[in-house]
Amino acid sequence: MNNEKESALTAMNTNGRSKLTALLYKTLMSFVGVLVLSMGESFMLAANMGMDPFTSANLGGSSLLHMGLGNFQLMVNFVIFIFVLFSDRHMIGIGTVINMVLVGYEIQWFSAIRQSLFGTANSLTLQIINAVIGLIIFTYGASMYMTANVGVAPYDGVAPIISRWTHLRYRVVRVIQDIIVMGLAYLVGGPFGILTFIVAFCTGPLIEFWTDKVNQKIYNLI
């Protein structure tokens, strides 16, 4: 009888350690994904052909208030985070915190590194090269961070909540959300261009490609 209890306790402890190890690996996966995503954003910023709607709006707002992107985006994320927390706290996880705190600062950091290594993209060819590299890296990082499944960015949590409240399809709500934020980005003078539309409406298939071919396999190993 005692041996059975000891075996059960051992199994429970082993299972607990396994879950903790898996969580740590998934957190690391989310962290690396956000790091890669931010690197991609820095190349898109250098291309000067627009940014994703949320970052574009934050860049415009931070410029108007003479603040760094990291500080401004953190404040905006915190406001959205409070909304998501009280609306559906199940969407919050360690990945939420990683994304909301780090992305703005990492874009600043990678932009400085990219500038020192490669200089300014002062021709259309260099702009296109930076845009393509940025999109590839950005979508891979976005796929990795989302596949880790340890919480969504505050901005990404808004559409599912509104969709549930209004009974509208998620895709419809997300498109409306991105269009509103694109309009805001334009009004505040954020980087606005072809990349803004591409990131908002056309990167889904590339993110799915990275998820199916690479990141889901990494997640399954975890």
Predicted regions span which residues?
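Core subunits and conserved enzymes of cellular information-processing
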Residues: 2-222
